[in-house]
Design a protein with these regions (language model features):
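Nucleotide/pyrophosphate-binding catalytic subdomain
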Residues: 1-216, 311, 385-390, 402, ...
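A structural alpha-helix within SAM-dependent methyltransferase catalytic domains
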Residues: 23, 27-30, 162, 220, ...
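Short phosphate-binding/catalytic loops that engage adenosine nucleotides
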Residues: 34, 90, 224, 291, ...
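Short hydrophobic alpha-helical runs that function as membrane-insertion/retention elements
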Residues: 37, 168-172, 226-228, 294, ...
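Glycine-rich beta-alpha junction loops
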Residues: 43-44, 175-177, 222-226, 230-235, ...
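Conserved beta-strand termini and adjacent loop/short-helix elements that scaffold enzyme active sites
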Residues: 95-97, 229-231, 296
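Phosphate/diphosphate-binding glycine-rich loops and adjacent basic-rich segments that engage nucleotide
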Residues: 134, 187, 192-193, 202-263
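A conserved regulatory-domain signal marking ACT and ACT-like small-molecule sensing domains
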Residues: 237-423
Length: 423
């Protein structure tokens, strides 16, 4: 049975007019041929509304009951979409994550998908109906609702596509595809017809917002084609997929995009006992709280001091602040949080093989008078820390320095089967 999975985010479902517009997309695909399974997010603003209600009654940040409450948003969207499709003459059934067989780990608020049964989804598709599945949620081993955290609905869609062996997973949003920079801050940014999954994962991690890193990583592991398209246009979007290409890497443009992230905090930790390494204790604290670390710098040990620094999400600083202060104090040291920084990254392939790229990055920012600190390099990403208020200036400078507003790289046309992702 040929299957297509489509995912619609909160912005695409924010009003009834947008719900109907998304339903027309689904109807078009359903009438054209393959069976269609749809994954939906909560309607725009609904999750924030539910979080405010929980905060008003003093609910803990991550708990069983909060997950029960937040799951209402996606359930509302799924039922509303199924009702809309039914009114258009398209038979549809809404399924919660539990009903769709989505199994998760036990971490409330940030669970991982551990498996999908999908028997009821298959039964609906076999009966000619559209299966509308709630994203962002499943059930843990105890049978309790668990939400998936950042990127949860995208991850649900990719996991379902993998389980159903779908031809592709289409993710619909409000932009035309993956861009060479965020088009909201740089109108000259170019829509990319095709992006390698590894590069897309780096772009997502480094600040590209439309697709989450975990969704792309899962798609790459499971061989799922992903296409992100604009729900309001017929633009072809961006294909995120591996592709065979006979030309050597040296003939292609190595730099694909410039990304930025202002949800960044730089954390500086020091201790006065140079005989002890506090790094293992610091990273234990971060890991126990699910806090992702990016750039890391260490200096010392010196005669009387050991220092280290790293970046985390600014929005997660409160989660780890007290525990880090406690660890540092146990070493006779302290912690400083710098919240006034941004991260700008040049993303592509084979970047370490071209040492001139790091030189070009630093020279361009220096010429623009943008202070820099902490540079990190890999084959797919060059990242640098800049003052928060100069982040957009740095994006514009590097986009120009690497000539990313020019024509698409050779051979960047979408694969025949097509898939798209967007920044």
């Amino acid at each position: 049975m040929a299957v297509l999975v489509q995912k619609y985010g909160g912005t695409s479902l924010q009003t009834l007019d947008r719900v109907r517009r998304a339903a027309l997309r689904i109807e078009e695909a359903w009438r054209r041929g393959p069976s269609v399974a749809v994954v939906v997010s909560a309607r725009g603003g609904r999750t924030d509304e539910l979080l405010r209600l929980a905060a008003d009654v003093g609910a803990p940040a991550a708990s069983r009951e909060l997950d029960q409450l937040l799951a209402v948003g996606e359930a509302e969207s799924a039922a509303l979409m199924a009702l809309t499709l039914g009114a258009m003459g398209v038979p549809a059934v809404s399924l919660t994550g539990a009903q769709a067989g989505v199994r998760t780990t036990d971490r409330h608020g940030d669970a991982l998908v551990s498996g999908i049964g999908a028997e009821r989804v298959r039964a609906a598709l076999a009966g000619g109906r559209v299966a509308v599945v709630t994203g962002f949620q499943g059930v843990d081993r105890a049978g309790d609702v668990a939400t998936l955290g950042r990127g949860g609905s995208d991850t649900t869609a990719v996991a379902l596509a993998a389980r159903l062996r779908a031809a592709r997973c289409e993710i619909y949003t409000d932009v035309d595809g993956v861009f060479s920079a965020d088009p909201r801050v740089l109108p000259a940014a170019r829509c990319l017809p095709w992006v390698d999954p590894g590069v897309m994962a780096e772009m997502a991690f480094a600040g590209a917002r439309v697709l989450h890193t975990r969704c792309i990583e899962l798609a790459a592991m499971e061989g799922v084609e992903v296409r992100v398209r604009n729900v309001s246009s017929q633009a072809p979007g961006t294909t995120v997929a591996e592709r065979q290409d006979d030309r050597p890497l040296e003939t292609r443009r190595a730099v694909v995009a410039v990304t930025h992230d202002t949800d960044v905090a730089r954390v500086l930790v020091h201790c006065r006992d140079s005989r002890r390494d506090l790094a293992p204790d610091v990273f234990d604290v971060l890991a126990a709280r699910g806090t992702v670390v990016d750039l890391v710098a260490r200096s010392g040990p010196y005669e009387n001091e050991f220092r280290m620094g790293f970046t985390i999400r600014r929005s997660e600083a409160g989660r780890v602040r007290d525990a880090l202060h406690e660890v540092a104090a146990s070493f006779g040291g302290g912690v400083h949080f710098d919240m006034d920084v941004g991260k700008v990254s040049v993303v592509g392939m084979g970047l370490l093989s071209r040492p001139e790229y790091a030189a070009r990055l630093m020279a361009a920012l220096a010429a623009a008078g943008i202070p820099t600190s902490w540079i990190s390099t890999s084959q797919t990403r060059l990242s640098v820390i800049v003052p928060r208020e100069r982040t957009v200036d740095a994006v514009e400078t590097l986009h120009r320095a690497f000539d990313l507003a020019g024509p698409p790289p050779d051979g960047a046309a979408p694969a025949a089967s097509g898939r798209s992702a967007t920044v």
